[in-house]
Curated annotation (Swiss-Prot):
Family according to the record: Belongs to the OXA1/ALB3/YidC family. Type 1 subfamily.
Compositionally biased intervals (Low complexity): 31-54
Record-annotated membrane-spanning stretches: 5-25, 350-370, 420-440, 454-474, 494-514
Source taxon at top rank: Bacteria
GO cellular-component term (any): plasma membrane
GO molecular function: membrane insertase activity
Compartment list: Cell inner membrane
Quaternary state and interactors: Interacts with the Sec translocase complex via SecD. Specifically interacts with transmembrane segments of nascent integral membrane proteins during membrane integration.
Entry protein name: Membrane protein insertase YidC
Amino acid sequence: MEKRALIAVILSIVFFYGYSALFPPPKKEAPAPSAQQAVTGSQPGAPQASVAAVPAPSPVPAAAVKAQQKEIAVETPDYTAVFSTQGGSLTRLVLKKYRETADLTGKHVTLVDERDPSAYTLSTRAAGIGLDPSALFVSSADSLTVEAGEEKKELAFTWISPAGVTVRKIYTFQGGNYGIDMVYQTANSGTARVGAAFQTVMTYPAVPRVKESRLETFGPVTFAQDKLTEEKVKDLVGQGKSYSAPLWSGFADKYFLSAVVGQGGSIATAAVRSTPRGMLEDTITAPETSLNPGESKSVAYRLYFGPKDLDILKAQGNSLERAIDLGWFAMLAKPLLHSLKFFYKYVHNYGIAIIIITVILKIIFYPLTHSSYKSMKQMQKLQPKMQEVREKYKNDRDAMNKAIMELYQTHKVNPVGGCLPMLVQIPVFFALYKALMFSIELRHAPFMLWIQDLAGKDPYYVTPIIMGITMVIQQKMTPSQMDPMQQKMMMALPVVFTFMFLNFPSGLVLYWLVNNVLTIIQQSYINKSIAAAEAK
């Protein structure tokens, strides 16, 4: 890469990350909306009675609840989920197609694993009818197996309050799909009108169980008002965050997402907080509703526990693919991700797919590279005359600038011609950076030889060092327009970049290395072309 391009990249990186750090987008705590009806149900001609306060069941000791609860395992081709009759909640979810390490004998990724009943996820609250997370439900099955492509299967949990209110919590599973449908069906068999606002409580450890890299992202995520908000765990200590009418809310790390997705406005608010037990809690509250005697209503959600794969998330709908934050250059990063998958179908190696994409990008940008290099050559030839002008008008800056501009016009040289074409490529670089840095496709994907995880760093630092050497070669080949001091500063760049890339994903380093090698080949060809043209 030319020196000007390197300067542009560094300045862009500083601006890109510095601006985000210094001027983060304001996060307003949204007020809770007025209760609205987002439920469906029968409307019998029952008289409108006043809402009755339903007494809460007598508290049951935690040890007794744990002894009475029963676990139900659900097996699908993609995951194993274990539910508890306590709250009809989820106690464990293991992804069958993903492991914690690149080693095939490593443990499968576990998104939910709670042995403490007070920390079960997807537990349910509804104060108006006396339902709390410790309530014991009755399950419709002792176990469930869903095969790939098989018809949907249901697992229902039923609870009846002392006042005669029946709550059915129904989960629907489908083979080959990470999405789970969840519906609350409520029927009032009592004699008084009751009101309730169901709360689904998701819990997550405040510290990630597995941190795959120093660049790991982790914490609550909420999509509301067409905007993704990612909260930092440290910002939730001592205070929570509330969101009005979000489309979905949950927890995410670099590669996986756990979320509750609203259906037909079924989420009134989502409130996230850090608990004294060292857990994160996301309380999803449905719009408040009331039921007359003999009336029934339902409220629906869509659950997702799975990988942050662009295609899989998009197939789920509800803008769930926005959980993959590709930054300012998402419009470029998404096509690059699709291209990566496209070439993988044919070569079955993501490392080779990265090389193919790099070659294609080099071909696309060749006219710009040629124009940039040619302009730099012309500027290099003008250096002696420009130096004469500077000496002649060293005491008159206005006259010197005028003379230099006349020199440019006479020789038809654009002073920024060597830089602007390269600046056009900067957005593509950042888009590819985002695509490769956060692509689950590269996670544990082998390339060849010692590189067995393209999402992890090069274990022996071979590729970053070779990359640094190629940068030195590029600098030697690039026409110089700098004074000795500037040249010394530029010579330090390969060292800086080498150390910076030591802990970068090897897939990203591979791209940069191949790009450098192709640039060296390009420069050699352009040098010969220009020399041949001048010899004629």
